[in-house]
Structure formats: structure tokens, C-alpha cells
Amino acid sequence: MMLLYYTLSFILLPVYFIIIFIRLLIGKEDIRRIQERFAIGKQRQNSALDFIQMSVNKEGFTDHKTTSYVDMHRNASLMYKLSLERSYAHSLVWIHAASVGEVMTALTLIHNISKLAPNVRFLITSWTNASAKILSTKLPKIATHQFLPIDNVIFTRKFLRNWQPDLGIFIESELWPCTINEGAKYCKLLLINARISNKSFKAWLKRKRFFQLIIKNFSKIIVQSERDLQKFNALGISDAMNLGNIKFANEKLLVNQEKLSKLILHLDNRRVLVFASTHPEDEEVILPIINNLKEQFIDCYIILIPRHPERIKSIINNCKLHHLSATAKSQNDLPVLNNDLYIVDRFGEMGLFFSVATISFIGGSFKQGGHNILEAAYFSNCIIFGPDMSKNTDIAKGILQNNAAIQIKNGKDLLNTLTSLLNANNALKLKTYRENALKFVENNQKKILDEYLQIIKQFLP
């Protein structure tokens, strides 16, 4: 099966190029970094070679005016041999994080692993532009980011030769067969916070043997829920273990305190509703109810944070269709208070707006399986989400059981829920939801992080 996949990846190579070109045209690829899809560019530094080059310079062998041809030839041969004997000053942990949510988990891992092993350096690979933009402002100095190359043996092997990782950690559900199979030849691989959607589970049941061939490359498999453990078992993987969702361990989003102070003063005691990580399907539900909310609660201000900020033009056009006045953050750094809503078309400032929010609706929950509801919980927001939380089933179930969030079915349900929560008579109810959300995330955080780190520690180089 793996040989067949490798063969197909060769045959379909022209198709990969076309896909990358199309992604480039529609803005899903960064033209300045397109070479990374083909494993061209960055690579791990060879400290042994650097050392020899410094030593040679000190001895003067590289000075062509004083060095004989024999010495230069001998020295070049020595440097070449050392370049093949890869020797590095630091161990390298490679973390693959598909997109934004997994990248936040990767940053938490880097922060905590570096405490356990100060000599370790990190390589983060991801697939999306959104993840790269987040990392451009949050990546620590001990880490490097590179886009994951196309899953073809030519590019995968070149990527692995360039980086020579000592440990690989894959987060959640991206299973690139070639990358994983080749990666296991270089270092031990861990699959953590693993999950399988219902759709993927049905597909893998038809290709169970291929799934097993991929998964056997991992030295340890940690799933995020009992439901996922059952799916792995059904697919013939008996050695997986469930430690819960590591997203509980993600650190509270950073907030620029100077910006926060300005925003609080500017909002002038208005109650803020945040609609976070929204997709078009969410906005179809949200935009029609805004005028109704504004009429009932004049002290209410609405902030929309789309999952993909590049959609800003289409969102503003949709606002006009619903007779809503909207301003983008790229146009005004502070909200225009006499407008109906403010659209945050910038990455990396979610924490700033959760800081001033009373209630947060988490998007992607009408069709995409839901996004991370824990980020808002850290800021003691009252959390609302839609009917589809299939990507975060256990977290959604747990937070609902703890009376720390509300799940709605449709637009009418959302309007009724917000109207009830914003009613002055329900102030205590709103306060309880907010307090419970913070308790829920804090109670789970340390235990889960410690358990994950105990496992990872066993494999650190």
C-alpha cells in the first residue's frame, strides 16, 4: 500500500504543481515562501562544519595568497567529510501543527519542553498562511517555522536531510503518509492530541490496512478523548492512550496592556459581544440578528473576528446587504462606536477583544465542527456555540455539563439566548456562566499538561 502511494505521488506530481499554483492565485500560498513547499531554503545549521571553518580561518589556511594548493585541497576534503558527519550544538524537536489551533498548542509545548530541556531547539511546520501569520509575531527565538513540503518522497527526503530532526511530534489529525513514513527513518515520532472525525473514520475503515501502515511509524499515540480511543481501537490500533485534550494546557492568549487600556477607555462601559473565528455559514446567522440586538440594547457593541481575515471585502459587502454599518480594524485601529459592528481583519489580537467581551460566540460551529472554545474561557467570557462541535466533542460536552457555556441550534435560538443573557434581570445568570467558564478551563489545565509532558520527556533527545 505504501509503495502504491509513493508511486501515485510520483505520477500525480504535475497535479501537485497545479494545486500549489491555484492556491497561490487565490491567496492561500505566500509567494515569498513558495519554495518551502519543495523543501528549498531553510535548513539546520551544522555546528561541526562551522567549527572547522572557524578553526581553518584562525590557522590562515583559507587565505589563497599564503596557502598551498595541497593544503587547500586537504582542508576542503576535511570540511566536506565533517559536513557529512552531522554534529549539532543543539538537539532539534520537530513539531507539525496543521493550522492555527494546533500552532497554539505547539507554542505551549515549546514553552514547557524548553524548561525540561534548555538545550533543545524547535522546528514548527504547518500548512496554512493563517498559521504562518500567527507565528510571525509569536514564534520564540529558539524556534523556526517552515511550511510543510508537498507529501512526495522527493521533497520529503530533501526536507528531512536538511533538518535532521531528533524527535518529531505531530499534533491532532494531519496524517501525511510519505512525511510520516520517511520521518520515522530519521527519528522517533509521537502523535499527540490525536482525533479522527466521523467522516475520516468512515473513510479509514475502508482503508484500515493503510491506516495501520501509517500509524505504526509512531512510537507513541495519545488521543484527546475516549471516543477517539475507541475509533483508533476499531481501526486496529491497540496501543493508543487517552490523556484528554491538550488544548486545556494552551496558555492564555497574550494581550498588549497598553492597547487594552486604550480600548477599555474608548468603549466607555459598553457591553461587548464578540463573534470569534467566524465562517460565512456563521455570518449568515449572525448578521440578520444584529439590528434587533442593537435596538433592544443600546449599550451593546458588536465585534466580529473572522477566521480568515482575507474575506474582509465580502464580509463588508454582506453587512451592507443587511443594512449594517461596519468598519475594519485595518481602517481604524479603534472601533467606530456609532457603527453597527467592528471587524477585526488582523491576526494575533483575539485575546485583546476577549479581554473586553462579556459574551463570546465561537464560530465554525454551524458547519465546520467548531473551533477552540477554551481561549474565550480563559477570559471568563460567557460562551455560546452552534450545533456542530464534532471537532471538539468532549470539550463541548464537558463545558455544557459544568454549566459554563450554551449551545444554540439556529439564528432564532441565538437571538433569544443573547436577549435573555443581556436582560438586566439575568445579570446573576450571566455572571455564573462567566465564572464557570474560567473554573472549567483552570481545573483541567495543569493535570493534562503534566501528563503529556511526562510522556514527551521520555523521548526527548
Swiss-Prot record:
Domain of life (superkingdom): Bacteria
Site (Transition state stabilizer): 172, 247
Pathway: Bacterial outer membrane biogenesis; LPS core biosynthesis
Record's keyword annotation contains Ubl conjugation: no
Topological type in the membrane: Single-pass membrane protein
GO-annotated molecular function: Kdo transferase activity
Role: Involved in lipopolysaccharide (LPS) biosynthesis. Catalyzes the transfer of 3-deoxy-D-manno-octulosonate (Kdo) residue(s) from CMP-Kdo to lipid IV(A), the tetraacyldisaccharide-1,4'-bisphosphate precursor of lipid A.
Name this polypeptide is given: 3-deoxy-D-manno-octulosonic acid transferase
Organism field: Rickettsia prowazekii (strain Madrid E)
Gene name linked to the record: waaA
